[in-house]
Curated annotation (Swiss-Prot):
It is found in: Cytoplasm. The lineage of its organism: Bacteria, Pseudomonadati, Pseudomonadota, Alphaproteobacteria, Hyphomicrobiales. It comes from the Bacteria. The gene is pheS. This is Phenylalanine--tRNA ligase alpha subunit. Keywords: Aminoacyl-tRNA synthetase, ATP-binding, Cytoplasm, Ligase, Magnesium, Metal-binding, Nucleotide-binding, Protein biosynthesis.
Length: 369
């Protein structure tokens, strides 16, 4: 048996003896690493004569290829075995009777919990919950919200569009919950014109939105909540008070300092982004203290064009609106590191971060008590 055959036999035995990924990696480094046994054989080719190189080259390269293939096959086997073992450990016999315990009742997803917390806060301020369709028209998603033609948000790389229907109209998955604001304003304006009921609008809008984005802090489908107030006397001071009260209640702190920075949103004018004071020195963010600032939401006074297109005279009525990502503020409040985990359907994750079914958020009992 030649040296190459002995070396190959030894390496293949080591590969077969590996019982986990670390073992496979150790064999790979020992054989194919910079100073591995096969790598050292390859280095000897440089000192051989052309005739020797012609004979030994194919043999050594063949050894390298066979070792690489064996490593890949063994790694695949170990991964399949690990998955099978995990499935066996976590297997649930669905024919068994349900155990009457807290675990058998499941857990409330953090997104659902935070939506309940937010709506409980705004309901206490006199707001109603409004909802709308996930599939919208270009008009309600963009035009009625003062997005001009050619705006980047209208491009295919930002928005999920459907194929045009028989009328040539192209619908889309809404990129924000703002279309519900327009639907609501149109409804109230029609009620005012037909019935003479000129009622103020105070709504909060939780829902799913869709954009072509995916990383640790973004998801192609995410939850958003917006708020809208329209009245003859709505102003920036009202907006600031509402948002301060919300932040204090949501983060469960007695006081909070807010900082408003000028920004731009097509549907509001002026537009601002709101930062709140916090302490980020520890493993978890602490709100209401410290010297750091963290962006929490965007807001502004409803743009006159939006009011006008929704049936309101901007010379008579004013409004303010705000919006925030539900997943983002859930991560901030409860210390969740990766937004993608919200949608992985991992039972262990939901058991860790989820809430008991009877933990109904109330301002009296404490939102997350």
């Amino acid at each position: 048996m030649s040296d190459l055959e002995q070396l190959e036999r030894q390496i293949l035995e080591d590969i077969a003896a590996a019982v986990d990924e670390q073992g496979i990696e150790a064999v790979r480094v020992a054989a194919l690493g910079k100073k591995g046994t096969v790598s050292e054989k390859l280095k000897t080719l440089g000192g051989m004569s052309p005739e020797e190189r012609q004979m030994q080259g194919p043999a050594i390269n063949g050894l390298k290829n066979r070792v690489t293939e064996a490593l890949s096959e063994r790694r695949t086997e170990l991964r399949k075995a690990a998955v099978a073992a995990r499935l066996e450990r976590e297997k649930v016999d669905v024919t068994l009777p349900v155990r009457e315990s807290a675990a058998s009742r499941g857990r409330i997803h953090p997104i659902s919990q935070v939506i309940d917390e937010i709506t409980a806060i705004f309901a206490d301020m006199g707001f109603s919950i409004a909802e709308g369709p996930d599939i919208e028209t270009d008009y309600y998603n963009f035009t009625a919200l003062n997005f001009p033609e050619g705006h980047p948000a209208r491009e295919m790389h930002d928005t999920f569009f459907f194929n045009p229907d028989e009328k040539g109209e192209r619908k889309l998955l809404r990129t924000h919950t703002s279309p519900v604001q327009v639907h609501t304003m149109e409804k109230f304006a029609a009620m005012r014109d037909k019935e003479g009921r000129d009622e103020p609008i105070r709504i909060v809008i939780p829902g799913k939105t869709y954009r072509m984005d995916s990383d640790a802090t973004h998801s192609p489908m995410f939850h958003q909540v917006e708020g809208l107030v329209v009245d003859k006397s709505a102003n920036v001071a009202n907006m600031k008070w509402v948002l301060e009260e919300f932040c204090k209640a949501f983060f469960e702190v007695p006081s909070v300092k807010m900082r408003m920075r000028p920004s731009f949103f097509p549907f509001t004018e002026p537009s601002v982004e709101v930062d709140i004071q916090c302490d980020r020195s520890g493993p978890h963010v602490k709100f209401g203290e410290g010297n750091d600032w963290l962006e929490i939401l965007g807001c502004g006074m409803v743009h006159p064009n939006v009011l006008r297109m929704s049936g309101y005279d901007p010379e008579v009525y004013q409004g303010f609106a705000w919006g925030m990502g539900i997943g983002r503020i859930a991560m901030l409040k409860y210390g969740m590191p990766d937004l993608r985990a919200f949608f992985d359907a991992d039972v262990r994750w939901i058991e860790h971060y989820g809430f008991r079914p009877l933990d109904i958020p109330t301002l009296f009992g404490g939102l997350s008590a």
